[in-house]
Amino acid sequence: MGKRVAIIGAGVSGLASIRSCLEEGLEPTCFERSEDIGGLWKFSEHAEEGRASIYQSVFTNSSKEMMCFPDFPYPDDFPNFMHNSKLQEYITVFSKEKNLLKYIQFKTLVCSVNKRPDFSVSGQWDITTERDGKRESATFDAVLICSGHHVYPNLPEESFPGLKLFKGKCFHSREYKEPGIFKGKRVLVIGLGNSGCDIATELSHTAEQVIISSRSGSWVMSRVWDDGYPWDMMFITRFETFLKNSLPTIISDWWYMKQMNARFKHENYGLMPLNGTLRKEPVFNDELPACILCGTVSIKPNVKAFTETSAIFEDGTVFEAIDCVIFATGYNYAYPFLDESIIKSKNNEITLFKGIFPPKLEKPTMAVIGFVQSLGATIPTTDLQARWAVQVIKGTCTLPSVTDMMNDIDKKREGKLKWFGTSETVQTDYISYMDELASFIGAKPNIPWLFLTDPKLAVEVFFGPCSPYQFRLVGPGKWPGARNAILTQWDRTLKPMKTRAVGNPQKPCMLCHLVKLFVLPVLFIAVFLALI
């Protein structure tokens, strides 16, 4: 084996990192503080300190063809959007098939990660771990941090005057597990993210009244998109990205808002974002609009102040006799085992080159995997991040100078503020980011060449969903089954829905979809030109 690599965390990022190390002949050792793999997706009856926590009813927001490991498709009969237990089943099968479990030390807490005295020459790290009360130290050639960012809850109590006076229950959404104990209660959920909306709509079936308080609003998308197909297989395409980047900003913004409002007018539901043209990550919830229509969930602005039993909103209205306040206010980014001078985290801004590498290390032997967020699935993103990180650790790929990396970070930060706003500085565009990472290791598909040599595949790659298999067509880790997986991805999408024979399942009409995408912006341009 080659260099020794420490991997912190055995969620999907950690598993991708173990596999990438093995593919490139490195020696991985993964430290996992719990007794099982899965990280965020491993449900527990109680929230555990230092570990991500989910509620019992969590389903994926990405469909199975878009969120698999790129050389390991889900079984045909798996549903397109999975319950957390189903995804955990897939993760377990993957880890066993790839023989990853033997590289994981369970129930092991990483206490500290420090540079060795000769780090500027060796690039090595001293890592102290603890298991069953016993501490041990070991030296590693590199470290991959895969501990996630849904661990340390953000509870902005100072932003809500009077909260300490409130006599009802008050807790972060990570503590929420199931709705039974809220029967007949009056509940205020603060935050309009995925967790806040999921919890609110679930509670609406048992609670007396549920209100969501939102500071800035949000786009709300459905998992069910055009003609009933999974949203991401229709929305996340290279062609759509090409249009977005090619059209004038005014046209691109208009088209984006039209897509977001296709299901319902957000203004009518009190959900409209303050700046609707920002590409902030939308909320995925199939129930919320219906709950608002039925009156079981109401949307209110930010809370101005609390009293002993009530919440006063910024519009002057009051929600009285509150039994419980649930803060779905996200998480803070922290690495308690690491000197903060290596990875700085302040005001949601972190200093990482491409969201992965600390730029000022003398040796590029540390990487953060799975930190970046995008309107795309986590698993393929972490897989590609890990593949590049391992190539850098091996020395096969090199990083730019510190100056160039810092300039890139500053440039990307400006772009992110423009597209996503101040609260989403870890967010990025999915396809652009994936292509950038893939180009570093020679895994980016050559679209023009594909049109010349394999037009059938090229059409699916460019106009169809940008599925993970595309990034295993070429380069290190190339998968011989990638081409067939791309050409059969719609078959696997339709298979679990074929539970009653009513004719042949229909794949999407790509031509009709493309016409819809292309013609409307053209018509808008024509009308715009006619009016000036």
From Swiss-Prot:
Keyword annotations from UniProtKB, A to Z: Endoplasmic reticulum, FAD, Flavoprotein, Membrane, Microsome, Monooxygenase, NADP, Oxidoreductase, Phosphoprotein, Transmembrane, Transmembrane helix
Main localization of the protein described in the UniProt heading: membrane
Pfam families: FMO-like (PF00743)
Documented EC number(s): 1.14.13.148, 1.14.13.32, 1.14.13.8
GO biological process terms on file: taurine biosynthetic process
GO MF term list: albendazole monooxygenase activity; flavin adenine dinucleotide binding; hypotaurine monooxygenase activity; N,N-dimethylaniline monooxygenase activity; NADP binding; trimethylamine monooxygenase activity
PTM-bearing positions, type Phosphoserine: S401
InterPro entries: FAD/NAD-bd_sf (IPR036188), Flavin_mOase (IPR000960), Flavin_mOase-like (IPR020946), Flavin_mOase_3 (IPR002255), FMO-like (IPR050346)
Needed cofactors: FAD
Enzyme class name: oxidoreductase
Enzymatic reactions: trimethylamine + NADPH + O2 = trimethylamine N-oxide + NADP(+) + H2O; N,N-dimethylaniline + NADPH + O2 + H(+) = N,N-dimethylaniline N-oxide + NADP(+) + H2O; hypotaurine + NADPH + O2 + H(+) = taurine + NADP(+) + H2O; (S)-nicotine + NADPH + O2 = trans-(S)-nicotine N(1')-oxide + NADP(+) + H2O
Cystine bridges: none
Residues noted as binding FAD in the record, renumbered to the chain: G9, A10, G11, V12, S13, E32, L40, W41, N61, S62
Membrane topology category: Single-pass membrane protein
Alphabetized SUPFAM superfamilies for the sequence: FAD/NAD(P)-binding domain (SSF51905)
Residues that, per the record, bind NADP(+): T60, N61, S195, G196, C197, D198
Transmembrane portions of the chain: 512-532
Compartments in which it is found: Microsome membrane; Endoplasmic reticulum membrane
Cellular component terms (Gene Ontology): endoplasmic reticulum membrane
PANTHER family the UniProt entry points to: DIMETHYLANILINE MONOOXYGENASE
Family of this protein: Belongs to the FMO family.
General function of this protein: Essential hepatic enzyme that catalyzes the oxygenation of a wide variety of nitrogen- and sulfur-containing compounds including drugs as well as dietary compounds. Plays an important role in the metabolism of trimethylamine (TMA), via the production of trimethylamine N-oxide (TMAO) metabolite. TMA is generated by the action of gut microbiota using dietary precursors such as choline, choline containing compounds, betaine or L-carnitine. By regulating TMAO concentration, FMO3 directly impacts both platelet responsiveness and rate of thrombus formation.
Protein name, UniProt field: Flavin-containing monooxygenase 3
